[in-house]
Amino acid sequence: MEQRSHSEEVVEEALGGTKAKIVEAALATLKARGFARTSAREIANTGGFNQALIFYHFGSVQNALLAGLDFVSERRLRAYQPAFEEAETLPELAALAREIYREDLENGYVIVLGEMVAGGVSDRELGRQVVARLEPWVEMVEHKVRALVAGSLFEPMVPPRDMAFAIIALYLGIDMVSHLDGDRARAESLLDLGVRVAPLAEALLPSQSPDVR
């Protein structure tokens, strides 16, 4: 009997049964074939089921892919949010960002998001759906930025919402370029630079802020 992967077990636990199998196949096809070539037939071939099941359970290939993106995003939030909330300094946050980036690459999350963004460029409704799924990340970063700059010289100059959006956009851009280029060395070098520079920026912030916790 073929041994199932950990990711398959996690998806099935989250969604259950046939839906889980479809989502897992949709994600695998998206990673292997790209958005443009991820059709109902390709997903069904990957998962070994009738393509009619995709439309029965999700209504469209696009909805199945969005369900996969939902699963990936929610899983990442559950995995990273506790560490993000516990980080109290810029060096800790910079190190965490580097760790998240490496895990995203290893698990193929960069490819999933990158391909969905690519699809959203030519489909405005899909684009809106993808952007909406970034909102929890923007809110999480916004809360942290607000806490970090509280009481500092930066507080009146740094709108937390705008800064959070810029940080997410920068991270997404790094992910996308790494995916397109196939070379993660430059992205990792940039993240390593962030780790080295973070202590310098930290010196400009209040030494203690109870709101950071």
Regions found by a protein language model. Give the residues of each.
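N-terminal intrinsically disordered/low-complexity leader segments
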Residues: 1-17, 180, 205-213
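Solvent-exposed, amphipathic alpha-helical segments
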Residues: 21, 25-32, 79-83, 112, ...
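Helix-turn-helix
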Residues: 21, 25-63, 67
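Hydrophobic alpha-helical connector segments
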Residues: 67, 78-110, 160-167
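Short, basic, alpha-helical segments at the C-terminal edge of helix-turn-helix-like DNA-binding modules
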Residues: 70-75
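Outer-membrane beta-barrel domain signature
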Residues: 81, 132, 137-145
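Amphipathic alpha-helical segments used for helix-helix packing
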Residues: 92, 105-128
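Hydrophobic/aromatic-rich alpha-helical bundle segments in the mid-to-C-terminal region
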Residues: 125-131, 135, 149-213
